[in-house]
């Protein structure tokens, strides 16, 4: 028997996921059994977020409740906003997001509760507050005043408002909504693996998301998109 140690995880099935699947032979990506093409044609981003988190598309009442909850969790504390203002202006935005999620953990009343219900509450808070953190840093590093989130705008509309102090035409908002749907899930990738490795030690959800964001930053994962954008800007 060979004593050679095979390093890495190539060809090793670590676990399975029921959330998202890449189907190369069909050039398709599915979320909970729905193709992204179908979801982009028929759904808003909030509906897809509900689908990913809950396993099924919402009815009208479920969607209304989900949207109300998300909008109620958008605000960041004064402490976190002050911390964002103190962050270096040349910091990488992914490092800022990662740090903000860690700061959220320090304030979240459910941080030490790893029950499914508590994790769902924490997931909603992270989901709602992350765009606020992104926009706050974007404006702070440019020397502009931070714009508070609105409870009267959709997820995408609110992000534009916090970033640029205006909501663009519906076509642009819809295009951004579709981009969020396309980036919502991508099967059992390296950031998902990282998050699940962290939670396997019974660590908290914020820690898992922090690790996943650090992984996503890498040039062999989400960082590849950044490299493409920088190349396009250069060209």
Region annotations inferred by a language model:
Residues 1-233:
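Hydrophobic alpha-helical bundle cores within soluble ligand-binding/oligomerization subdomains
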């Amino acid at each position: 028997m060979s004593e050679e140690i095979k390093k890495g995880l190539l060809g090793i099935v670590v676990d399975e996921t029921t959330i998202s699947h890449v189907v190369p032979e069909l050039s398709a990506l599915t979320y909970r059994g729905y193709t992204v093409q179908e979801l982009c044609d028929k759904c808003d981003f909030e509906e897809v977020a509900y689908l990913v988190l809950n396993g099924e598309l919402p009815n009208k009442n479920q969607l209304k409740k989900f949207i109300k909850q998300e909008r109620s969790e958008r605000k960041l504390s004064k402490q976190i906003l002050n911390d964002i203002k103190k962050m270096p202006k040349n910091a990488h935005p992914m490092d800022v997001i990662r740090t903000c999620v860690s700061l959220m953990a320090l304030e979240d009343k459910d941080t030490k509760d790893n029950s499914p219900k508590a994790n769902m509450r924490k997931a909603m808070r992270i989901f709602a507050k992350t765009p606020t953190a992104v926009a706050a840093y974007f404006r702070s590093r440019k020397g502009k005043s931070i714009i508070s989130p609105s409870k009267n705008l959709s997820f995408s509309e609110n992000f534009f408002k916090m970033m640029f102090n205006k909501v663009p035409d519906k076509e642009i908002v819809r295009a951004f909504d579709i981009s969020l749907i396309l980036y919502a899930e991508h099967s059992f990738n390296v950031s998902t693996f990282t998050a699940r490795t962290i939670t396997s030690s019974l660590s908290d959800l914020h820690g898992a998301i922090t690790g996943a964001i650090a992984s996503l930053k890498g040039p062999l994962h989400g960082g590849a998109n950044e490299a493409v954008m920088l190349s396009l800007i250069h060209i």
